[in-house]
């Protein structure tokens, strides 16, 4: 990369999702509804698992961590996007952009690693039921969660370190509603091929390796379920849980691979996929995981009755 004298860009201008006021109002209502479902839904999951003495297995501990990451991940972009619907000139400072990039990749990569840990937990519970409590003990569970967070942190540091060394001299317009790394790299005043290659390898490696590990574990489990088909309610319940996990994996990794594991060229679907990845995807935790789990639903009803309805009386 050449080291020349450039006029340093101090802010970026975001184009947003639409410039039409009527469309912006409709989008605001839709995305506000999504965010107001994500926030209390995942907070309720965390509170339920934390306060209910029966939800102490590793699966629920991992689910609470996933709920926290969903709140964090969606809150990195959603509040600013909602405000920008009513702002004519959508601006984010250079430092704010770097911070947004860091936390977005930190939370996103941590969630990918955590989903892999959850697949390991499901595999152990089904294939090694007699040794499950010994294998997935509290210590190992905490270590795996900590490693997921550390992996996300390292990945995010790599992405940000590559961005801050690039020169930005204008233009400073990002064709997005948030500080997307693919857009930022595209407007740098230098040959960004080496940085882009490392970013793609980092994101692609995490996405592809985690996806392969997840699909292999689920393929093994589905093959096992096929042999045990008709063996009872527990098998059907485990199979239903497995399909829920597979749905999550497809919704998480599909958009991420599309956006970050390819050359950073602009395509017409980029904004749609980004919205799905940053705002719609976090909806799936309360919907797919929680509403399909009888124990969590029962604990939620008990929590609402005890702490909310009783206070109103």
Curated annotation (Swiss-Prot):
Instruction: Name the PROSITE patterns on file.
Output: G_PROTEIN_RECEP_F1_2
Q: Which residues lie on this side of the membrane: Cytoplasmic?
A: 50-57, 121-139, 220-237, 292-313
One term of GO molecular function: G protein-coupled receptor activity
Q: Name the principal localization, coarsely classed.
A: membrane
Q: List the disulfide bonds.
A: 97-189
Matching CDD domains: 7tmA_OR4N-like (cd15937)
User: Topological domains (Extracellular): residue ranges?
Assistant: 1-25, 80-100, 159-195, 261-271
In which compartments does the protein localize? Cell membrane
Q: How does it sit in the membrane?
A: Multi-pass membrane protein
What Pfam families does the annotation carry? 7tm_4
Q: Which domain of life is it from?
A: Eukaryota
- List residues traversing the bilayer: 26-49, 58-79, 101-120, 140-158, 196-219, 238-260, 272-291
Q: Which UniProt keywords apply?
A: Cell membrane, Disulfide bond, G-protein coupled receptor, Glycoprotein, Membrane, Olfaction, Receptor, Sensory transduction, Transducer, Transmembrane, Transmembrane helix
Specify the glycosylation sites in chain numbering: 5
The cross-references to PANTHER family, in alphabetical order and at most eight, read: OLFACTORY RECEPTOR (PTHR48002)
Q: Which family does it belong to?
A: Belongs to the G-protein coupled receptor 1 family.
Primary role? Odorant receptor.
| Name of the protein in its database record | Olfactory receptor 4M2
Species of the source: Homo sapiens (Human)
